[in-house]
């Protein structure tokens, strides 16, 4: 499977009422657009995570972003909460984070910081944003174990997108699927051969199981191929995902995106 990303300016389409446009920037970073608002999730344009080099460039340059209405950050890890990037996109708009993460973003230029507890919902314009639990960890440094972590359900005009954040497989996917009518699930599929040996990331087969338990309609994989966070080959996660999807008869439900290429659903 050949995937390509590059710095060319994306051709963002005109979005009609009822449509949603999804652009994968790379790793866990996404731009979600409706006909009313633009939402940025876990944005990171940095070339380094401390000592870990970015191996694939973002799908487009940060200055090609449209005006951003809301920003969501799933947890405090450096590959999801990048203060340098957040400072560049902050323009006095609201940002939503889990409980305990607000002090990492309050000084970056956001108008208001919404800290959510699990299952809590905030209304931002036409969007309902809900924080869901996951099986991961939230510390940015060794001592700050108080920080929560999770995924976001974004609902607007009958369309519902679930950005899972980082997680291992856990039984909670079934409850998330029961609470929300999820249409599109953005699920992590990389870093499952982690150097630490900790089970905090799903492998591709577990992502398929999670998708089935969520009862979603479309699976978009993420969190692979950008940073070397595990020992698995960079090309392996989507191949294993599609193989597992074929076994379960859901290959047509999997959308492997190309960085920087908008898709309208």
Regions from the PLM with identified roles:
Residues 2-17, 25, 31-76, 83-88, ...:
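Pre-active-site segment of Zn-dependent metallo-hydrolases
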Residues 2-17, 97-159, 239-265:
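Metallo-beta-lactamase
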Residues 19-21, 89-95, 159-161:
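Short active-site oxyanion
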Residues 25, 29-33, 123-183, 202-205:
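Catalytic core of the metallo-beta-lactamase
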Residues 32, 42, 75, 82, ...:
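Divalent metal-coordination and catalytic microenvironments
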Residues 43-46, 75-76, 134-136, 165-167, ...:
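Active-site metal-binding loops of divalent metal-dependent hydrolases
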Residues 49, 81, 105, 139, ...:
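Glycine/Thr-rich phosphate-binding loops of Rossmann-like dinucleotide-binding domains
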Residues 70, 94-104, 170-258:
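Cap/insert and terminal regions of metallo-dependent hydrolase folds
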């Amino acid at each position: 499977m050949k995937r390509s990303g590059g710095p060319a300016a994306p051709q963002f389409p005109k979005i009609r009422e009822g449509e949603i446009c999804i652009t994968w920037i790379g790793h866990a970073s996404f731009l979600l657009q409706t006909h009313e608002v633009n939402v940025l999730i876990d944005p990171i344009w940095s070339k380094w995570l401390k000592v870990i080099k970015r191996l694939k460039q973002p799908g487009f340059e940060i200055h090609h972003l449209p005006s951003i209405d809301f920003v969501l950050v799933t947890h405090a890890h450096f590959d999801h909460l990048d203060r340098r990037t957040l400072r560049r996109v902050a323009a006095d708009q609201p940002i939503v984070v889990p409980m305990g993460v607000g002090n990492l973003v309050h000084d970056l230029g956001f108008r208001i910081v919404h800290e959510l507890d699990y299952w809590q919902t905030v209304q931002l314009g036409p969007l309902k944003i809900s924080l869901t639990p996951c099986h991961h960890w939230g510390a940015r440094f060794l001592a700050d174990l108080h920080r929560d972590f999770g995924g976001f359900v974004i609902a607007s005009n009958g369309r519902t997108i679930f950005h899972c954040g980082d997680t291992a497989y856990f039984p909670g996917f079934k409850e998330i699927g029961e609470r929300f009518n999820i249409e599109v699930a953005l699920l992590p599929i990389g870093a499952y051969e982690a150097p630490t040996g900790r089970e905090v990331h799903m492998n591709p087969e577990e992502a398929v199981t999670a998708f089935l338990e969520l009862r979603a309609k479309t699976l978009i994989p993420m969190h692979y191929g950008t940073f070397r966070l595990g020992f698995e080959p960079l090309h392996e996660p989507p191949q294993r995902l599609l193989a597992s999807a074929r076994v379960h008869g859901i290959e047509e439900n999997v959308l492997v995106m190309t960085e920087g290429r908008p898709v309208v659903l």
